UniProtKB/Swiss-Prot annotation:
Biased composition (Polar residues): 532-544
Disulfide bonds: 59-100, 63-105, 74-90
Protein name: ADAMTS-like protein 2
Domain PLAC: 918-956
C-alpha cells in the first residue's frame, strides 16, 4: 500500500482517462519510434498498418493510483507499389497508458516504495539475505537524482541499492505531480489525467484564471512595542501562497502558532533552527540569517492550502518597532464582490427624554460582531437593541491581548480579488484580522450623550437594516464602526438623508484606555475622526462608547444642503483628489491621485453616492525624493559579562542604508563615517556588587572511552584571584568517571565512485560513516578506529605495481591550539582487478608519504563558570545565577564559541510556599482564553490580571 503518497485527494477522485496521441505527432508515452520507408514507383515495397489493441494489462498497484497499458503492433506486407504513391510506416504510438485503482490506500499500510524494497528481502547478496527499506528524498542524498529510481537500504544502513521503480510509483515534477511509466516520471494534471499538463492556478482551481480567490496583503508596524510576543496577523484555514517577511533586519523573531496558542516554532522564548515544518497540512519553510552580519531576511512561506487557522506572532526582544509584511490568498466567499456599503441609523424613537433612557450600556463583548465577512448582521426582536454577531472571524480567534502601544502603530490589511489593484484603505467592504482596533461613533443632533447596547441573534441583511429594524425618518443618529489596527473596515452608506455628514468630538476625562473585546485589542484615543471613506486609517484609533462612565463623546450633524432643481445625476460626481505625499522620503517613491465623490457644492461625501461604474482609475506617478543617508544601527546591549564586580556589556554597531524602497541593507562603515555621524559605543562598563575570590570551572572534557568501557573526564579549576585566596575545602572536583557510547555503532560505506585515472594514478573513493543501529550518523570517535574500512583504493585498467596510497587525514587531536593529525598510508597494488596490500619495502620506504602532520585549530578560548548562587526565594520558584567568563590563558576575552556558552541563569524550584484559603471572588471571566494568556506571559497586563484572576495567581497561593 502506498501510504506515503503526496498526491492531492482531488486528483485521485477523478475517473482515469486514457490518453492516445493521434495525428502525425507521436506522444511522449510511445515506446517505439516510427520510421519512414517510402520507395519510388515500380519497386517492391512494404505496406504498414496497425493491428488491434491488446487488452489492458493488470493494474500495477492495488490502490493509490497505478498504471495499466495496451499495446498494438505495426503489421506489414510486401506488395508492388503504385507509381507516384508514397508508402509510409505506421503513424502513432504502439503503447498507451491510463491510470487505474485510484482509490486511496489505507493509512496504516505500506507505501508502494516500501513494498518494492521489501520484495528484495528474499534475495541473497554476497552470501546473505538483508532486510530492505526505502530511502526518500527528504532523508537521504541520493546517488541518483532520477525521480523514478528506487533507492533501498538495509535496515542497518550498511548497504544500498538503486533499481528502476515500478510503473505507478509516485514521483514529483517541478510544478506537477507525476507517476513513473517505463522508468520516466510522467505528469498527471490537476484533472487527474495521465500526460495532462493542466495545472492549478494560484487559487487552487484546475485550469483556472486566478479570479476565484482574494489576495490579502498587509503590514505590521508598531511604535514603542512591548517586549515579548505580539500577534502580527491571523491566517484563516484554506490560505494559499503565504508569505510573511520581516522587511527590516532586527533582533525580532517570527513565530507561528495555532489558534489555541500552541507554537510550531520559535515559541516559549526559544529560537528554533531555520528549516521546513509540516504544519496545517502543508510544508512551511522558515528561514532567517544566523546572525546580524549574515545577509538575507527572515521570512515564512508556505504553498498551502492550510487545513487550520494560524497565528503569526513576533517575539520583540528590544522594544524597537518591527516592520513585517504579510500576504496570502483565500478563495472568495459568494458575497465578497457584492457587499454594499452599510450605514446604521438609530431612530429618534429609541431615545427618550429622560437621562436614564438616553444612556444605554454598550455590550463590549459583542462589539466585534458588528462586521461579518458577508456583510450581514444579527438582530434581536427588541426595538431598542441592535444585535450583532460576536464571532467576527471564522474559525474563532484565540482570545489573546497583545499589549497596548502608546506610540505610533499601523497594521494594515488590504484584500483584493485576483487581478485587481490594492490601493489604500479598503472601502465599503469588511476586511478581517485579529490585531484590530475598533471605532464606534454615536451622533445626536442635540449633543446628547448616547450609546447603544449590542446583542446578537437573528440574521438580517445589511440592506434592510435601515427600513426594517431602525425605522425611517430624515433625522436620525448614525453609527459607524471602523476597525483599523489591521484595517478592518465597514463604511457607512446613506439611508434617507444623503446630504448629512457626521463629525465626532471627544471629551477626555483621562488618558487613552484599552479594552479587550472577544480577543481583539481596542485602543482608545482622542483623535478627531470623520466618517468620510477618505479618512486616514493608519496610526489612528478611536473608542467604543464609555464602559466605565469616565469618557463621553458628542456628535453634531451638519444641516442638510440639498439643492433645489438639481437632478440626482448631477447631485454627485467624481473628482480627482490632490496628490498624496510621496511614498518614500528618500529614494524613488510613488505619488498617487485617487478619485473622491463630491456633492454639487464641492463637499466631499461617501463614495457610495457616486456611480461606481464611472469612477476614474487612480493615477500613479513616480516621485524622486532625496537619497537616503546612511545611519548607524545598534543591537541591544548584552548582559553584563560578570554577575559580580565590574564587567562589560557589548552590542553590535553596523552601518545601514535604505538602498531602495523597502530594501534596507547593511553597508560598509565608511559610508556612515563619511557623513560624520557619531558612531555609537560598542562596549560599556557595568558594575554589580563586589564578589570575593571564588572558584571557576571550565566545561567537562569529552569522554574518550570506547563503547562499553569506562574512562575519566576532566575540567580545569582556577581561582578568580590569587589561588591562595580561595578556600581549598570548597574547591570543586576536577575529574569524574564516564562511560563510552553503546556498542551498536558500526562503520557504513557508500558505493565506490568512478576511477580517476589509469594504473598507478587511478583512485576510487567512497564515503565511510559511523552510524547507530537506527541509521543516525555520529562522530567517528564513537566507532572502533581499528576496524574502519578503507575509503581510498587503487584502480585502473590493468595490473599495477605496488605504490604508496594515503587515506584521508583524521581530525586534529585537539579542539584548540596546536595539535597533531594522522592518516593511514598503505603499500598497495592492483592484481587481477583487486587491490592488494603489500609490505613497505616493495613500495620503497624512502618514498613513503608522512603519516603525521601538525595542525592548528582556533585559539584556546575556554568558558569558565563560577558556582551557582543561592536561590532568590526560600519557597516556590526562584532564580539562581553564576558568572560565565571567557578566558584565553589568564586574560578575559570575547573569542569563545557562543553556541556552547554555559547558561548563567536558571530557575530553582524549592518546597511549596504556605498556602492561604482560596479567594472565591477571584474567578476567571467567562469567554476569556486564560490558558493562552498564561502561555504568552500576559498575566502582568492590567486586563488579564483581572480577567484571569484565578489562573494568573502565583503557584501554591
Amino acid at each position: 500500500m502506498d501510504g506515503r503518497r503526496q498526491h492531492p485527494h482531488w486528483a485521485w477522485s477523478l475517473l482515469a482517462v486514457a490518453v492516445v496521441a493521434g495525428g502525425a505527432a507521436p506522444t511522449e508515452a510511445s515506446d517505439n519510434s516510427p520510421t519512414s520507408n517510402s520507395l519510388e514507383g515500380g519497386a517492391d515495397t512494404t505496406a504498414y498498418w496497425w493491428g488491434e489493441w491488446t487488452k489492458w494489462t493488470a493494474c500495477s498497484r492495488s490502490c493509490g493510483g497505478g498504471v495499466t497499458s495496451q499495446e498494438r503492433h505495426c503489421l506489414q506486407q510486401r506488395r508492388k507499389s503504385v507509381p507516384g504513391t508514397g508508402n509510409r510506416t505506421c503513424v502513432g504510438t504502439s503503447k498507451r497508458y491510463q491510470l487505474c485503482r485510484v482509490q486511496e490506500c489505507p493509512p496504516d499500510g505500506r507505501s508502494f516504495r516500501e513494498e518494492q524494497c521489501v520484495s528484495f528481502n528474499s534475495r541473497v547478496y554476497d552470501g546473505r539475505a538483508y532486510q530492505w527499506k526505502p530511502l526518500y528524498p527528504d532523508d537521504y542524498v541520493h546517488i541518483s537524482s532520477k525521480p523514478c529510481d528506487l533507492h533501498c537500504s538495509t535496515v542497518d544502513g550498511q548497504r544500498q541499492l538503486t533499481v528502476p521503480a515500478r510503473d505507478g510509483t509516485s514521483c514529483k515534477l517541478t510544478d506537477l505531480r507525476g507517476v513513473c511509466v517505463s522508468g520516466k516520471c510522467e505528469p498527471i494534471g490537476c484533472d487527474g489525467v495521465l500526460f495532462s499538463t493542466h495545472t492549478l492556478d494560484k487559487c487552487g482551481v484546475c485550469q483556472g484564471d486566478g479570479s476565484s480567490c482574494t489576495h490579502v496583503t498587509g503590514n505590521y508596524r508598531k511604535g514603542n512595542n512591548h517586549l515579548g510576543y505580539s500577534l502580527v496577523t491571523h491566517i484563516p484555514a484554506g490560505a494559499r501562497d503565504i508569505q510573511i517577511v520581516e522587511r527590516k533586519k532586527s533582533a525580532d523573531v517570527l513565530a507561528l502558532a495555532d489558534e489555541a496558542g500552541f507554537y510550531f516554532f520559535n515559541g516559549n522564548y526559544k529560537v528554533d533552527s531555520p528549516k521546513n515544518f509540516n504544519i496545517a497540512g502543508t510544508v512551511v519553510k522558515y528561514r532567517r540569517p544566523m546572525d546580524v552580519y549574515e545577509t538575507g531576511i527572515e521570512y515564512i512561506v508556505a504553498q498551502g492550502p492550510t487545513n487550520q487557522g494560524l497565528n503569526v506572532m513576533v517575539w520583540n526582544q528590544n522594544g524597537k518597532s518591527p516592520s513585517i509584511t504579510f500576504e496570502y490568498t483565500l478563495l472568495q466567499s459568494p458575497h465578497m464582490h457584492h457587499l454594499p456599503p452599510v450605514y446604521y441609523s438609530f431612530s429618534e424613537a429609541a431615545s427618550q427624554s429622560t437621562e436614564s433612557t438616553e444612556r444605554q450600556e454598550l455590550d463590549s463583548a459583542r462589539l466585534l460582531g458588528f462586521m461579518q465577512h458577508n456583510g450581514s448582521l444579527y438582530r434581536q426582536t427588541s426595538s431598542e437593541r441592535l444585535g450583532l454577531n460576536s464571532q467576527l472571524f471564522q474559525p474563532p480567534a484565540p482570545e489573546v491581548e497583545l499589549g497596548p502601544s502608546r506610540g505610533q502603530e499601523s497594521n494594515e490589511v488590504c484584500k483584493q480579488a485576483s487581478g485587481g489593484v490594492c490601493e489604500g484603505p479598503p472601502r465599503g467592504k469588511g476586511f478581517q484580522d485579529h490585531n484590530a482596533t475598533g471605532r464606534a461613533f454615536s451622533a445626536d443632533k442635540d449633543d446628547r450623550e448616547i450609546s447603544a447596547h449590542f446583542t446578537s441573534h437573528e440574521l438580517l441583511s445589511a440592506n434592510t437594516i435601515s427600513d426594517q429594524l431602525l425605522g425611517t425618518g430624515s433625522e436620525s443618529e448614525e453609527f459607524s464602526l471602523n476597525e483599523t489596527m489591521n484595517s478592518i473596515f465597514a463604511q457607512g452608506a446613506p439611508r434617507s438623508s444623503p446630504a448629512e455628514s457626521l463629525y465626532v468630538d471627544y471629551e477626555e476625562n483621562e488618558g487613552p484606555a484599552a479594552y479587550l473585546i472577544n480577543g481583539s485589542y481596542l485602543e482608545l484615543s482622542s483623535d478627531r475622526i470623520n466618517t468620510s471613506s477618505e479618512a486616514p486609517f493608519p496610526n489612528t484609533s478611536a473608542s467604543p462608547p464609555n464602559l466605565a462612565g469616565n469618557r463621553t463623546h458628542k456628535a453634531r450633524t451638519r444641516p442638510k444642503a440639498r439643492k433645489q432643481g438639481v437632478s440626482p445625476a448631477d447631485m454627485y460626481r467624481w473628482k480627482l483628489s490632490s496628490h498624496e505625499p510621496c511614498s518614500a522620503t528618500c529614494t524613488t517613491g510613488v505619488m498617487s491621485t485617487y478619485a473622491m465623490c463630491v456633492r454639487y457644492d464641492g463637499v466631499e461625501v461617501d463614495d457610495s453616492y457616486c456611480d461606481a461604474l464611472t469612477r476614474p482609475e487612480p493615477v500613479h506617478e513616480f516621485c524622486a525624493g532625496r537619497e537616503c543617508q546612511p545611519r548607524w544601527e545598534t543591537s541591544s546591549w548584552s548582559e553584563c559579562s560578570r554577575t559580580c564586580g565590574e564587567g562589560h556589556q557589548f552590542r553590535i554597531v553596523r552601518c545601514w542604508k535604505m538602498l531602495s524602497p523597502g530594501f534596507d541593507s547593511s553597508v560598509y562603515s565608511d559610508l556612515c563615517e563619511a557623513t560624520e555621524a557619531v558612531r555609537p559605543e560598542e562596549r560599556k562598563t557595568c558594575r554589580n556588587p563586589a564578589c570575593g575570590p571564588q572558584w571557576e570551572m571550565s566545561e567537562w572534557s569529552e569522554c574518550t572511552a570506547k563503547c562499553g568501557e569506562r574512562s575519566v573526564v576532566t575540567r580545569d579549576i582556577r581561582c578568580s584571584e590569587d589561588e591562595k585566596l580561595c578556600d581549598p575545602s570548597t574547591k570543586p572536583v576536577g575529574e569524574k568517571n564516564c562511560t563510552g557510547p553503546p556498542c551498536d555503532r558500526q562503520w557504513t560505506v557508500s558505493d565506490w565512485g568512478p576511477c580517476s585515472g589509469s594504473c598507478g594514478q587511478g583512485r576510487t573513493i567512497r564515503h565511510v560513516y559511523c552510524k547507530t543501529s537506527d541509521g543516525r550518523v555520529v562522530p567517528e570517535s564513537q566507532c572502533q578506529t581499528e576496524t574502519k574500512p578503507l575509503a581510498i583504493h587503487p584502480c585502473g585498467d590493468k595490473n599495477c605495481p605496488a605504490h604508496w596510497l594515503a587515506q584521508d587525514w583524521e581530525r586534529c587531536n585537539t579542539t584548540c591550539g596546536r595539535g597533531v593529525k594522522k592518516r593511514l598510508v598503505l603499500c598497495m597494488e592492483l592484481a587481477n582487478g583487486k587491490p592488494q596490500i603489500r609490505s613497505g619495502p616493495e613500495c620503497g620506504l624512502a618514498r613513503k608519504p608522512p603519516e603525521e602532520s601538525t595542525c592548528f585549530e582556533r585559539p584556546c578560548f575556554k568558558w569558565y563558570t563560577s558556582p551557582w548562587s543561592e536561590c532568590t526565594k526560600t519557597c516556590g520558584v526562584g532564580v539562581r545565577m553564576r558568572d560565565v567568563k571567557c578566558y584565553q590563558g589568564t586574560d578575559i576575552v570575547r573569542g569563545c564559541d557562543p553556541l556552547v556558552k554555559p547558561v548563567g541563569r536558571q530557575a530553582c524550584d524549592l518546597q511549596p510556599c504556605p498556602t492561604e484559603p482560596p479567594d472565591d471572588s477571584c474567578q476567571d471571566q467567562p469567554g476569556t482564553n486564560c490558558a493562552l494568556a498564561i502561555k504568552v506571559n500576559l498575566c502582568g497586563h492590567w486586563y488579564y490580571s483581572k480577567a484571569c484572576c484565578r489562573s494568573c495567581r502565583p503557584p501554591h497561593s
